[in-house]
Design a protein with these regions (language model features):
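Bacterial N-terminal signal peptides
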Residues: 7-17
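Solvent-exposed helix-loop boundary motif
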Residues: 20-158, 174-179, 189-197, 236, ...
């Protein structure tokens, strides 16, 4: 061990070079150190206190520098030669080396040097970037002043100049019109549309193209397809017989919401709690009910003899995973059976989030009698808690059809007699024709008059317990009330918090006790991915400890704040992105650029990616 200490001292004293940027800068905790600890150490020495080994916790600085069960100190700030962590990662004895061989994790020499260098610098910790509110960064100064179209380009060009790179040339007009039409509508431009764009010599021809595409119903459908994938929309129940259920009115509402450019904060509240908040000024009375069908978008079982408590636990967990993933960019589902091993979510946090959804009436979605009934489980669109919904855009058409059907019914005689008996009666052929027309009209009317699985709140929400190890049969866990994750603050809602309180918290500013800026960051990152093929943080569904650092953190922060500043206007954010010169760059890259930046993290060119399956199919 003495010789090992000498090796460690030598490593630190010599200041051996570390590859990449880390060699030129002091180690940054979030950029350089946290990824090493998270991937290799936190599973046993992280937030999960129940599975923590040796009393050592490395995700918290105070705990990491404290003496542990063995009497050693894993980290002695400024003294890597006295830090047990440095000794263990350089140990060759399989019984004492860290990470242990059975973990199949092996640190590289560069990673070991980084850890030693970081401890020598005082072992400074930083909060995880995703839980620090975005800052209003000013774009960096650039040498080239005539390149960009908006502030996005200033951030991109500033980074490229710092890296000694230049942006790619603009894409040719045909490539550009195809790119933006695919990205904004999910469809290719027609030959006539391409020709029209090429023939348009106005300076604002591209802006006119963007405005036309953004106002198109096809753009609303494209954005709806993106959203419906996130919220796991499906026309069937998912389990066992995979029977159909009529959830399509929710899909139509999502399309209309994007067509009407509903602000994303309202879009959020209506889906999570439309049944609780009701319509706002200017909204159709049916819209909250249509939007609240989001809460019914989950796999459901129609199996005979199901265990009610089991599936109630399954449904609850599904809702928690989706809400936390879509709006928070978090893997809270990892805390279903134990405290999260990489992020500060506890099992109590998991079930407390689930308690928000304990008021949803799922009882009649499951047959408690122990067998499947056609009018109950196999056909979930004809059972309570459901309501008959006529979409706001179909109401006039429904009234028109009702009037026509009533008129035809009055025209038809109750009995057809020979023409010579009652000459004033219509001919049989006329009656048949009217009957056929009546059947057609009734079919059209029935297509409008649909039933939709919506959310109905129970007068008394169900009791929710923490399930030890996620076991639905274990009822020894503590009863939890609906609340937000502890490390994110206190909801401070009067009375029992509801889904409406949760939705409001997700879009309320941090200064007012919410996490609106965090939600905006997750959403802006996803929207960027639509236009560039990948997010500025590439792990778009996981901004936590196992996710990636953003390649352009200042740009991502600015996008987040711009989304809020615009009134949560998604269409404006899309317009800002696709009108940037960065978006309009060619995706071609010379060999030297591909060798240096094969994944296009620096944005010296446009990205290349496969079209979504929906686009290929529709094309």
């Amino acid at each position: 061990m003495h010789s090992l200490r000498l090796i460690v001292v030598a490593i630190v004293a010599s200041g051996l070079a570390v590859s990449g940027q880390a060699a030129e800068k002091a180690p940054d905790f979030n950029r350089d150190i946290r990824p090493i600890l998270s991937r290799n150490c936190f599973a046993c020495h992280g937030p999960d206190e129940h599975d923590r080994r040796g009393g050592l916790r490395l995700d918290d600085r105070d705990a990491a520098i404290t003496e542990v069960d063995s009497g050693a100190r894993a980290i002695v700030p400024g003294r890597p030669d006295e830090s047990e962590l440095v000794a263990r990662i350089n140990e060759t004895d399989p019984d004492t080396t860290m990470p242990p061989p059975e973990s199949n994790h092996v640190l590289t020499a560069a990673q070991k040097q980084l850890l030693a260098k970081w401890i020598a610098a005082g072992a400074p910790y930083s909060p995880h970037w995703a839980y620090v509110p975005p800052h209003a960064h000013a774009p960096p100064a650039t040498k080239q002043v005539d390149w960009g179209n908006n502030w996005i380009d200033e951030f991109v060009l500033g980074r490229l100049e710092a890296e000694g790179l230049a942006p790619a040339p603009d894409a040719d007009p045909v490539t550009l019109v195809r790119r933006v039409t695919f990205d904004l509508t999910g469809l290719p431009p027609t030959p006539a549309e391409v020709e029209a764009y090429l023939a348009d010599t106005r300076p604002d021809a591209y802006m006119s193209l963007i405005d036309r595409l953004l106002a198109s119903p096809r753009h609303a459908e494209r954005m709806a397809a993106w959203w419906l994938d996130l919220v796991r929309y499906a026309d069937t129940v998912g389990y066992h017989g995979d029977q159909p259920h009529n959830i399509s009115p929710y899909r139509d509402w999502v399309i209309k919401a994007f067509l009407d450019n509903v602000p994303f904060d309202r879009f959020t509240v209506l889906q999570l709690a439309g049944d609780l908040v009701g319509p706002a000024a200017g909204e159709h009375p049916d819209e909250p009910a249509l939007a609240s069908a989001y809460n019914r978008l989950l796999q459901t079982t129609h199996e005979g003899g199901l265990q009610l408590k089991e599936y109630r636990a399954i449904y609850q967990a599904d809702r928690i995973r989706n809400v936390s993933g879509v709006w928070m960019g978090a893997t809270v589902g990892c805390a279903q059976c134990h405290d999260h091993k990489y992020d500060p979510y506890t099992s109590r946090d998991f079930y407390a989030l689930g308690a928000f959804f304990a008021d949803i009436d799922d009882e009649k979605h499951m047959d408690k009698a122990g067998f499947s009934r056609q009018n109950l489980n196999a056909t979930p669109t004809v059972r309570e808690p459901e309501i008959k919904v006529v979409g706001p855009f179909d109401r006039d058409r429904a009234a028109e059809l009702d009037a026509r059907i009533h008129s035809l019914e009055n025209e038809l005689p109750p009995l057809v007699l020979p023409p010579w008996a009652q000459p004033e009666q219509p001919e049989p052929e006329t009656v048949v024709a009217k009957r056929l027309e009546l059947e057609r009209l009734e079919a059209d009317r029935n297509a409008i008059d649909r039933k939709l699985m919506v959310t109905r709140a129970l007068a008394e929400p169900r009791q929710v317990r923490l399930l030890p190890r996620g076991n639905w049969m274990d009822e020894t866990g503590m009863v939890v009330q609906p609340t937000i994750p502890t490390f994110l603050g206190d909801l401070s809602a009067p009375g029992r918090p509801t889904r409406a309180d949760l939705a409001a918290w997700l879009v309320r500013p941090v200064a007012q006790g919410g996490v609106g800026e965090f939600t905006a960051r997750v959403t802006a990152n996803r929207i960027w991915a639509i236009c560039f093929g990948t997010g500025l943080c590439r792990s778009v569904g996981d901004l936590g400890g196992q996710g990636e650092l953003p390649d352009h953190p200042e740009l991502l922060d600015r996008l987040s704040l711009e989304l809020i500043r615009s009134g949560w206007n998604v269409r404006d954010l899309v317009r800002t992105i696709v009108t940037s010169r960065a978006y309009r760059m060619s995706s071609d890259a010379p060999a030297d650029l591909l060798a240096r930046d094969p994944d296009n993290r620096l944005l010296a060119r446009q990205g290349r990616w496969r079209l979504p399956a929906e686009n290929v199919r529709d094309t």
